[in-house]
Amino acid sequence: MKVDFVVKDAWVFLTYRQCFEKRDVAVAGEKIYGVSPAICYPDATIIDGSGMYMIPGLVDIHMHIESSMTYPAEFSRITLPYGVTTVVADAHEIANVFGMDGIRWFMGQETLLDIFYA
């Protein structure tokens, strides 16, 4: 596996220990490849993570995007910088107003988040 970059010395939230610890994080493509106190991939780009914090992506399991008074593409642009990577959306309000056409329009939007519709 070719590692694209390594974030060195970041404070990484370890979910299994429920705390932050200094770690190196190796990334290959769009996936985290490894987390360790010391990672060495000579061909990888190094990013200095000193003083930075890393957490797993946040998942909002019940969201009414239309209640935010915006649409899915804009909602994802606003929330992603705060760590939200995935949303389970209940689009009943858009369905009440526009029916299936509204739901299809909502679901057809390109977003930066993973959005699942319930």
What is each of the regions a protein language model found here?
Residues 1-41:
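N-terminal metal-binding scaffold of metallo-dependent hydrolase/deaminase domains
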Residues 25-33, 65-66, 77-80, 106-108:
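Short, low-complexity, polar/charged sequence segments that are solvent-exposed and flexible
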Residues 20, 68, 96-99:
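Alpha-helix N-cap/helix-start motif
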Residues 15, 26, 49, 57-58, ...:
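Glycine-centered flexibility motif
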Residues 73-118:
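Divalent-metal coordination cores built from histidine and acidic residues
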Residues 13, 64, 92-93:
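Catalytic metal-binding/acid-base residues of hydrolase active sites
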Residues 34, 46-48, 117:
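Structural signal for conserved beta-strand scaffold positions within catalytic alpha/beta enzyme cores
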